[in-house]
Each structure stands twice: as C-alpha cells, then as structure tokens.
C-alpha cells in the first residue's frame, strides 16, 4: 500500500496524544497484495473512505475486502460534474497566464475543497461514532484530497497547526 500511515501519535493543543490505530490514510487500494489485505484485517479497519472520482475508481477499482465497508463519495465534485476539468481549456490557459494564475487556481481549489463538500461531511459523520473506527481514508495518490480529510480529522481532535504542517497536510486559514 502506497503512502499508508497512521494519523495517531500526534500531540493535541491541550497536550494529549491522538490514539494510534483509529485513523489511517493511504493512496488508492487497487491491486492489493494478500499481505496488504492481511494488514488491513489485522488493523480491524471498519470503513474505507474513498474520495476518488467515478473515472478514477473505474480505471483503478479498489480491492474488495470482506467485512470492511466501502464508501466512495468524490471529493472533487465540481471537477466530476464538469466532466473532469477546470472549465474550458481556453479559460484555464487564460487563468494560468494571469499574474499568479497557477498559484491562485491551485490555492482556490484546495481552499474551497472542504466547504459544503458532501464527501467530507460524510467523513465527519462517520468518525463521530466510535463504533465506525478504525477508518482508512484515501484518494488516488493519498496526498491532496486525503490530506484535506486527514487535516479535518486532526483539527476535530485538536491537533496543533504546526503538527498538521509537519505531516505534509494542507493548512487552511
């Protein structure tokens, strides 16, 4: 499993430590080895939460593991609804060549990603119930969308911003 790690062990702002073995993140879970499946079973993962688009899931279907519930709600819903792009090529090129265009496009998409997002809303609903844990959240590379989901989990648990930064997870103002 690529980019697999436990979110536990991080210090909260009030000095406690996030319990290990409850929240995991990774890249896509297609073509898992028997050993990977064994590890997920031994970790007692109850839910696998997938942020990938329909197209990504079609190209690289997740390995189905019995007794682990799978939920897939695309996190990039605007991208999915627009057919997988940030508007027309012409519009995108125009925006890229504006002053700080590429930075602004990327920053705005990540900044707005968790706002009113059904995917992250469902993630929060799941983690509120301890009986749903442990949970593994993932996207294709296990970085951006998964990073946002992991940051949300850690923020809810009270992990300091500096700790989130050390994990390589996006910070929002």
Identify what each model region corresponds to.
Residues 1-136, 149-173:
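Cys-dependent protein tyrosine phosphatase-like superfamily
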Residues 140-141, 145-146:
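Ser/Thr-glycine-rich phosphate-binding loops at phosphate-binding pockets of nucleotides
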């Amino acid at each position: 499993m690529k980019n697999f790690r436990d979110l536990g062990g991080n210090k909260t702002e009030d000095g406690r430590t996030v319990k290990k073995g409850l929240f995991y993140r990774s890249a896509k879970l297609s073509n898992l080895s028997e050993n990977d499946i064994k590890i997920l079973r031994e970790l007692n993962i109850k839910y696998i939460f997938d942020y990938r688009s329909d197209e990504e899931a079609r190209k690289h279907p997740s390995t189905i593991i019995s007794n682990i519930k799978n939920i897939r709600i695309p996190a990039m819903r605007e991208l999915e609804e627009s057919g997988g792009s940030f508007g027309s090529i012409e519009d995108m090129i125009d925006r890229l060549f504006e002053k700080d265009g590429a930075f602004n496009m990327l920053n705005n998409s990540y900044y707005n990603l968790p706002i009113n997002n059904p995917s992250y809303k469902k993630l929060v609903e799941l983690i509120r119930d301890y009986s749903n844990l442990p949970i593994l959240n993932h996207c294709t590379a296990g970085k951006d969308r998964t990073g946002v989901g992991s940051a949300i989990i850690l923020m809810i648990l009270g992990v300091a911003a500096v700790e989130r930064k050390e994990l390589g997870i996006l910070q929002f103002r």
